[in-house]
Amino acid sequence: MKKVFIRTFGCQMNEYDSDKMLAVLAEEHGGIEQVTQADEADIILFNTCSVREKAQEKVFSDLGRVRPLKEKNPGLIIGVAGCVASQEGENIIKRAPYVDVVFGPQTLHRLPKMIVDKETSGLSQVDISFPEIEKFDHLPPARVEGGAAFVSIMEGCSKYCSFCVVPYTRGEEFSRPLNDVLTEIANLAQQGVKEINLLGQNVNAYRGEMDDGEICDFATLLRIVHEIPGIERMRFTTSHPREFTDSIIECYRDLPKLVSHLHLPIQSGSDRVLSAMKRGYTALEYKSIIRKLRAIRPDLCLSSDFIVGFPGETEREFEQTLKLVKDIAFDLSFVFIYSPRPGTPAANLPDDTPHEEKVRRLEALNEVIEAETARINQTMVGTVQRCLVEGISKKDPDQLQARTANNRVVNFTGTPDMINQMIDLEITEAYTFSLRGKVVEA
């Protein structure tokens, strides 16, 4: 049985893609063993992300660490996948000729054939094309071990924000046909999955073709998934404010399985910065969406992404972001210091903000967000929350870990048969990033 080591960087789309890489290899070889140490593997894969600073150099650093394994065992297969693979392509082979296969997010289904071609020809294989929906046509049925699962409904992005590489590494937006998505979810439900997380770079741009040739939009998809037997909770990530329509907002009124948590990236509270980012909305328009959502779902918890130190961002503009965070009461959000991505328009903008100032802004924003997170957690003490038990607690092996509808981790004392089940927990203690609870006896 082939032993596979895979290291995944970046977003949930990459996590999903890594699972699919393992699935296609398992189908090809009649099963595989996933190992946690690279030196135990027959196949080593790095599924890369190009969002963070110096992503390319980190990949080559990782490759350098496994080079001695290749020298010791020439039959070892080393592969680079993901967005850095899409950006760098043949350059990876030039810099690291011991790499065997390089493939992008849209060609991971071709991985087994690429390995065979490498072993047959002796030549490294590179495939970073964008064959669109073909990828999903060639993936094996989903197999899961858990109560929650991701389902990719679309890929790519056509927004071309000035700082972002996604359109260049994952291609333009394309949606899976409606029936393909529903079949995968129904299959997961039959395997005991209770929570579905619909996945895409911009899920609310979903436009899936139906059998009759008509187009299903994202709000309609949510309503259909809501009725699939066995599915008890629905999430989605990530969405874009530009296409967060009233029909999607109304789903929060009508669909009780849709959780009271939304991740809706805004990036900045300054209209000038938003314009320079080419985000396509103003801070006021974003606030209008949130106002409508909270009018029909008052308990909605909102998380977001923020970039500080974008080229030209002034202290006043940063203060506008700080005020927006306080006004909307964001929690559980992600704050990043801007770093230029090669090939993006923003990379050409003059950046005169000292790094020390960017760090100060990062810390100031995180302080406000963490305070709000702690406040919300404290309000949950004494309440009973319906939770999905995910497994053994990461903090204490004698405890279990569950997740609330509003995306809080709850550690509690329970029994193994509770794993992957929905249970009621009374929240007894609150911390900044987690909760403690106890089982509510029936």
Swiss-Prot record:
[4Fe-4S] cluster 2 binds at C157, C161, C164. Its cofactor is [4Fe-4S] cluster. SUPFAM superfamilies: Radical SAM enzymes. Residues 143-375 form the Radical SAM core domain. Residues 2-120 form the MTTase N-terminal domain. It catalyses: N(6)-dimethylallyladenosine(37) in tRNA + (sulfur carrier)-SH + AH2 + 2 S-adenosyl-L-methionine = 2-methylsulfanyl-N(6)-dimethylallyladenosine(37) in tRNA + (sulfur carrier)-H + 5'-deoxyadenosine + L-methionine + A + S-adenosyl-L-homocysteine + 2 H(+). Binds 2 [4Fe-4S] clusters. One cluster is coordinated with 3 cysteines and an exchangeable S-adenosyl-L-methionine. Its main location: cytoplasm. Residues 378-441 form the TRAM domain. This is tRNA-2-methylthio-N(6)-dimethylallyladenosine synthase. It comes from Neisseria meningitidis serogroup B (strain ATCC BAA-335 / MC58).
